[in-house]
A protein has these predicted regions:
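Residue(s) in the substrate-gating loop at a strand-loop-helix junction
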Residues: 150
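Active-site helix of classical SDR
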Residues: 126, 167, 175
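Conserved glycine-rich cofactor-binding loop
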Residues: 19-20, 43
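Short, small/polar-rich loop/turn modules that mediate ligand/substrate recognition or access, typified
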Residues: 183, 188, 242-244
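Short C-terminal tail/terminal secondary-structure segment
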Residues: 2-5, 155, 232, 243-257
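Alpha-helical segment proximal to the catalytic Tyr-Lys
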Residues: 131, 180-181, 240
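Substrate-binding pocket helix/loop in short-chain dehydrogenase/reductase
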Residues: 102-103, 107-115, 212
């Protein structure tokens, strides 16, 4: 058993926002470790391209180009997945949005867009996929839900991303509340709080890597392997007893800023 602690062979996974950035890192890790992976993204062309790329890593990666920024979109994605798979072992709620604006001019739409995608969508997508998650779950092999939060929900980022910080702090607490309920159904809910990883959402880490790395105790930004490793841990047998917790993957930033 110890040799299979991190195996995902035979498992079915769905990663939202899986066509790029952190979602793509996680999806790549899952495929490499044997899972059948579905990735969702609103950009159909990019979603299909990423699925084809990741399929070359060894296991199938299937594109589901659906916009999950609304409750209806989340329900549509759930229907599309369940039309293809009778069960779902792993759900990664990764799709997210941010909004940067000064306090005096921060608009209501900057709250609505971010809270809808970052908090409401993870809840309602998990709710819609609950039948498939329950179908896969057993006491010996629970299904997994992994919410991607942020260190900005734990400590304060100097940038004025008010709704983003609030949404990620809220999703961390929602993770705990969902975890207590869903573990009754053999569904284990946890979260990952990434720090600086190169992506379109974190353009500072992408475009100014050395400058950002100098402010990180580990002296580097996160790599694809760092993120994939954290997600594989939580998704596999190794993470079965991690219920409601948030795994911080940030090179020490949270404790230094």
């Amino acid at each position: 058993m110890m040799t299979d602690l991190f195996s995902l062979k035979g498992r079915v996974a769905l990663v939202t926002g899986g066509s790029r950035g952190i979602g793509k890192m996680i999806a790549a890790g899952f495929v490499s470790y044997g899972a059948r992976v579905y990735i969702a993204s609103r950009n159909a062309a990019v979603c299909e391209q990423t699925a084809a790329e990741l399929s070359k890593l060894g296991g199938p990666c299937i594109a589901l180009p659906v916009n999950t920024s609304t409750v209806e979109g989340a329900q549509s994605l759930a229907s599309a997945l369940m039309a293809r798979e009778p069960r779902l072992d792993i759900l990664v709620n990764n799709a997210g949005a941010a909004w940067l604006a000064e306090f005096d001019s921060f608009p209501e739409k900057g709250w609505d867009k971010v809270m809808d995608l970052n908090v409401k969508t993870p809840f309602f997508l998990t709710q819609a996929l609950a039948p498939a998650l329950r179908a896969a779950a057993t006491p010996a092999k629970p299904s997994k839900v992994i919410n991607i939060v942020s260190i900005d929900g734990i400590s304060v980022n100097p940038q004025e991303t008010y709704s983003y910080a609030a949404s990620k702090a809220g999703l961390m607490h929602l993770t705990k509340r969902m975890a207590l309920r869903l573990v009754e159904d053999n569904i284990v809910v946890s979260a990952i709080a990434p720090g600086a990883f190169k992506s379109e959402m974190n353009i500072l880490a992408r475009d100014h890597e050395q400058e950002v790395a100098a402010r990180i105790p580990a002296r580097r930004v996160g790599t694809d392997e760092d993120m994939a490793g954290a997600a594989i841990y939580l998704a596999s047998r190794a993470g079965d007893y991690v219920v409601g917790s948030t795994l911080i993957v940030d090179g020490g930033v949270t404790y230094a800023r």
